[in-house]
Design a protein with these regions (language model features):
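Polybasic, low-complexity association/targeting segments
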Residues: 1-26, 140-142
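Intrinsically disordered, low-complexity boundary segments flanking structured domains
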Residues: 4-6, 43-44, 73-78
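Immediate flanking context of iron-sulfur cluster ligation sites
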Residues: 7-19, 41-64
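Local cysteine-cluster metal-coordination motifs and their immediate loop/turn environment
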Residues: 17-31, 57-76
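Compact Cys/His-rich
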Residues: 26-42
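Short flanking/linker segments adjacent to small metal-binding domains or redox-active Cys/His motifs
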Residues: 67-142
């Protein structure tokens, strides 16, 4: 008998918040007025209280350091099937931004729930997309 495993977007997986804690994000020297430890604690606590609706993980530098703190909201498996894609959020500091991110993730995240309008103002392009757009400018190759 042959068995098949489910892989990729077909898997049941929760929304994932990827929190940059590289060279600039989470660095109190760069943003001394922000409580970076509190933000991470708040995200972890909210994920624990979400009943598995979303998870949090940290990573090294994601790239757009001039827009720190950066959080990437990755869609759940169902959100991905419905067309949701990873959403990059810049300048994600303070209570209001953190609460908006938690609320959106708890509501289902990309592909499932609409983001809070104030959070949409903080959406940024992923570094790879910015590089692709920059390469498209200038003289055409022959």
């Amino acid at each position: 008998m042959t068995t098949y495993g489910v892989i990729g977007a077909a898997q049941a997986r929760p929304v994932t918040l990827v929190v940059c804690r590289g060279c600039c994000c989470g660095n109190p020297r760069k943003h001394p007025g922000s409580d970076h430890a509190w933000q991470l604690d708040r995200l972890y606590a909210a994920a624990a209280d979400s009943g598995g609706q979303f998870t949090v993980r940290t990573t090294d530098c994601l790239g757009p350091c001039d827009q720190a703190n950066v959080i990437v909201v990755q869609p759940s498996g169902e959100g991905r099937r419905r067309g949701g894609r990873a959403t990059w959020i810049g300048w994600a500091m303070g209570d209001a931004a953190t609460d908006d991110i938690v609320r959106w993730a708890a509501d289902g995240g990309p592909g499932i729930a609409e983001p809070p309008p104030t959070l949409e103002l903080q959406f940024i392009r992923p570094p790879g997309e910015v590089r692709k757009r920059a390469r498209g400018r200038g003289r055409a190759r022959r």
